[in-house]
Amino acid sequence: MSNNNKYFTITKKQYKKMRRNKIELLFNVKVLKKKNGRQKFKILHEVENKPKIPIKIIEDQPESPKPLKPPKPPKPPKGPDNPEEPDSPEEPKETDQPGGPDNPNAGNKKMPTPEEYVTRKEFNEFKDSNNQRLTKIENKVDKLEVKVDKLAEIVQTQGEEIKELKVEQKAQSETLQLILKTLQKMNDRLDRMETRLDKIDSPK
């Protein structure tokens, strides 16, 4: 996997593996291959609340076969005319650990792991931790959706009750208008009766 300022470049095989493990949903990871075939992961940054760096997918490239070492020449037979020659010193084997006069950490001493690198175990623990965080967030979202549904039901019920109150108020208003009309008619009748009584009681 290579990285530049614009995007990550990964193969289809790596992309499928990252999709299966949901890695690209949580954080950007750079895979570093060692000479002995082991892989270490470098966590670049979390992208939960940050924009993700785009990923460019390329075709898988077959690994080039390692060159074969030339066979050693056969040793000549031992005899008086051909005394045994001492074996030539073996060439030092290449190791992942740096050595030499400029490096005091040569030999079998294990180099300390830099802080920016993590082992596969630490990587899996980090991935599991993020999955747990996602699960908690999903549970909270589900609870919020339930609350929103209940609020929607309450609002709908209140809306229906308001409609019923409006209908009831309209009916009461019409009833009051009828009562007022009836009272007005009764007042008119009383006025007419009072006028008649005044005429009767007045002297001729």
From Swiss-Prot:
Domain of life where this protein originates: Bacteria
Residue intervals passing through the bilayer: none
Region of interest (Disordered), residue spans: 46-132
Basic and acidic residues composition-biased segments: 117-132
Name of the protein in its database record: UPF0134 protein MPN_655
Family stated for the protein in its record: Belongs to the UPF0134 family.
Positions with biased composition (Pro residues): 64-80
InterPro entries, alphabetized: DUF16
